[in-house]
Structure formats: structure tokens, C-alpha cells
């Protein structure tokens, strides 16, 4: 029920298996990037990065971006090329939303909904995008990492 009012779902990598992609794509308009734990099966379905402008807001998503304001070379090149308003990344599995003053963008890591990683609470982010603005940003907590339900 958490995704019922969503028009688009983005997954920032470490999918794990094709069944997760199938379930998301069957339920919603979904885009994703592969993560470092994802094998060839996932890497042939999802790209390394996604850039999309939605309602006038430019989003860049890549699994491993590096530390905020000190991104890795690949991410810096993508930021330079696309000039995103928002950088969505995964990898750490730790929820973080912070304004990046150096690169003039919003850095977002939604955390992780799965049970693998360093996170203690399973999380994801929801937001509205309309007329060039983001609004109603919510960090949704799904319970402790050992809890397996996601309705």
C-alpha cells in the first residue's frame, strides 16, 4: 500500500534478483540502476545510471556516487554533463537527504527496503514533483531490518 499513490518508482540499486524487478515493474512505472551486488542478470536489464527530467526537475540516479561533495570521478562527470537538481544514490543503504552546496544539488539516499546491509531500519523516500518543484518529501520507515513485510 506504500506505493499506491506513486506514479513512478525508482530503485537505486542492489536489487538482488529479477523477481524484485518483475514485481516492481508489474505494479508501477519503474526505473532502476544496478548496484554492486547485482550480477549480469540485473545488469542486462537496468543501466549503471539514469538521468530524467520530471516536471522540470532534473534527476540523476547512480548506485555508487561517493561521499557528498566528494563524489567519485564517474559521478562528477555525470553531474557536469547533466547538471541535475537531485542526485539519488544507494550503496550505503543509509537514509540521507542533504543539500550539496558544492555541486548545487539535493543529495538523496533512500536507504534500503531489504534486509542486507549496514542499515538498522528499512526505509525509502517519497516525494511529489510538480511544476519544477519538489514537495512533501517523506522518509518512510518499514521497520527493523529483520522484519520482512512490505505491503
Briefly describe each language-model feature range:
Residues 9, 14, 24, 35, ...:
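Divalent metal-coordination and catalytic microenvironments
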Residues 23-26, 37-103:
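Acidic, His/Gly-enriched loop-helix segments that form or flank divalent-metal centers
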Residues 31, 70-133, 137:
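Conserved beta-sheet core of the metallophosphoesterase superfamily
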Residues 54, 64, 110-112, 129, ...:
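Active-site donor-binding loop signature of nucleotide-sugar glycosyltransferases
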Residues 16, 67, 115:
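Glycine-/small-residue-rich active-site loops that bind phosphorylated ligands and cofactors
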